[in-house]
């Protein structure tokens, strides 16, 4: 696939499509500036480092108010929280020059927060990979965009947040990346809003 510059997109119902142009489907994580790297003091709980599941990664980031600081610059903010769910939807959008049409495409949304009309969709991963498949964020983004367009949700803005965690000795380092899409019909229109790194320091 790398040699042929191709990637695979799921279309739903067990169908897939080969698309030319890997750059249109994978996005490299941006470098985090030194000014956006913070030492975050915390009191370790029993389950903080218990496992390395995606759910645990997002729970740690939320329980330690890191997400609140990063997204809202307010550790006492009280966003509504919606846990992992799966849903299916028909989608139509573009990737590069290709038009993609899906039917009953199943997508998994790891975590969702809403505050003052801003919906943020989360994806969590272990380690610090160089890049990620954009559809992981775009499909849920498109899902909520459709609901907004149909006036089923009163939404001001839709963003996505990628949370990465790497364990170091008895602690962790978390990197957060907040994205949106400038064109809800074009998967390659991903845009970074901000990013930051939090080094968990035990009290």
What are the functions of these language-model segments?
Residues 1-203:
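Charged, terminal alpha-helix-loop-beta segments
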């Amino acid at each position: 696939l790398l040699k042929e510059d191709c990637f695979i997109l799921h279309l739903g119902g067990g169908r897939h499509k080969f698309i030319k142009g890997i750059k249109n489907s994978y996005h490299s994580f941006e470098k985090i500036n030194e000014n956006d790297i913070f030492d975050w003091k915390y009191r370790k709980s029993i389950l903080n480092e218990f496992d390395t599941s995606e759910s645990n990664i997002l729970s740690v980031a939320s329980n330690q108010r890191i997400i609140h600081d990063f997204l809202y610059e307010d550790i006492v903010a009280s966003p509504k929280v919606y846990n992992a769910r799966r849903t299916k939807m028909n989608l139509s959008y573009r990737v590069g020059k290709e038009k993609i049409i899906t039917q009953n495409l199943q997508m998994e949304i790891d975590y969702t927060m809403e505050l003052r009309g801003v919906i943020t969709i989360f994806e969590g991963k272990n380690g610090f990979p160089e890049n990620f498949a954009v559809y992981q964020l775009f499909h849920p983004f498109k899902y909520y965009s459709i609901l907004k367009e149909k006036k089923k949700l009163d939404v001001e803005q839709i963003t996505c947040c990628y949370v990465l965690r790497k364990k170091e000795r008895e602690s962790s380092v978390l990197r957060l990346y907040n994205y949106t899409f400038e064109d809800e019909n074009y998967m390659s229109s991903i845009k970074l809003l901000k990013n930051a790194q939090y080094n968990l320091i035990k009290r």
